[in-house]
């Protein structure tokens, strides 16, 4: 509203990347780089191969079975999910567990259709919020 002074937010210290990044930005950058590297990790391909079947007479050649609803989907309609969530990466102490969970073997992964994956992700997010409170 006009005329009222608004309290300024406290400035977050920028201690990383030569004083340009906050701690949150720094850990977000590392988390993003690890997730990107994980997209090319061989067990992800193995998990998809285990859920795959050939389709004859369709425009698409393969379908993948969702581990949650057991329905069959095209490649673009499924995602590889970590059975045990990778967790958070907000500080140095989180790094070993995050990397261990992120780069798990094929038995720690499952193929889910996008709707089932979204439901699982939302449930995990709500659980994390409840535990953080």
Question: Can you say where each PLM-predicted feature lies in the sequence?
Answer:
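Short Cys/His-centered divalent metal-binding micro-motifs
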Residues: 103-132
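Short, charged surface segments at domain edges that flank catalytic/cofactor-binding sites
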Residues: 7-68, 98-107
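The −1 position to Zn-ligating cysteines in a subset of zinc-ribbon hairpins
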Residues: 65, 79, 112
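Histidine-centered nuclease catalytic patch
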Residues: 71-109
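Intrinsic structural disorder/low-complexity segments
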Residues: 63, 85, 120-123
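Short, Lys/Arg-enriched N-terminal segments with co-localized hydrophobic residues
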Residues: 1-5
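Cys/His-coordinated zinc-binding microdomains
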Residues: 69-70, 117
């Amino acid at each position: 509203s006009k005329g009222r002074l608004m309290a300024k937010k406290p400035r977050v210290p920028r201690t990383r990347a030569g004083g340009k990044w906050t701690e949150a930005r720094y850990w977000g950058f590392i988390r993003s780089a690890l997730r990107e590297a994980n997209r090319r990790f061989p067990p992800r391909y193995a998990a998809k191969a285990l859920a795959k079947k050939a389709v004859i007479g369709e425009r698409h050649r393969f379908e993948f079975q969702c581990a949650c609803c057991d329905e069959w989907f095209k490649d673009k309609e499924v995602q590889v999910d970590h059975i045990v969530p990778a967790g958070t990466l907000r500080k140095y102490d989180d790094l070993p567990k995050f990397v261990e969970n992120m780069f798990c073997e094929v038995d720690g992964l499952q193929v889910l259709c996008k709707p089932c994956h979204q439901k699982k992700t939302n449930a995990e997010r709500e659980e994390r919020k409840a535990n953080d409170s």
